[in-house]
Amino acid sequence: MDGAWRVLDLSSFEGTLESDRGGISVHPESGEAVHVPVADLAIVLVGMGAKLSASVMHRLCTADVALLFCDWRGIPEGGAYSWSEHGRVAARHRAQAAMTLPRKKALHN
């Protein structure tokens, strides 16, 4: 995910997301569909009006793209991310698990 930089904000989006070759297709209720390569994505924010399938989640997680679910105000309230050993989140989990007890206590204060 070295080159991923793009945050796709669909928190107020109304429409459908579909898995597509090498990316996802964004289909607004009115307008043309847009193909977004997952290689460019770091984070995708989706709101209450977005419809997506497990295949979209699989495509994003496979590419180590974080998918955050937002409430009606656009504030993230949950998420899905890859459990890959090579991802950013997995690296952070390993680093936190390897901390000494005093450092773990300091982290939570």
Regions found by a protein language model. Give the residues of each.
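N-terminal intrinsically disordered, cationic/polar leader segments
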Residues: 1-46, 50-109
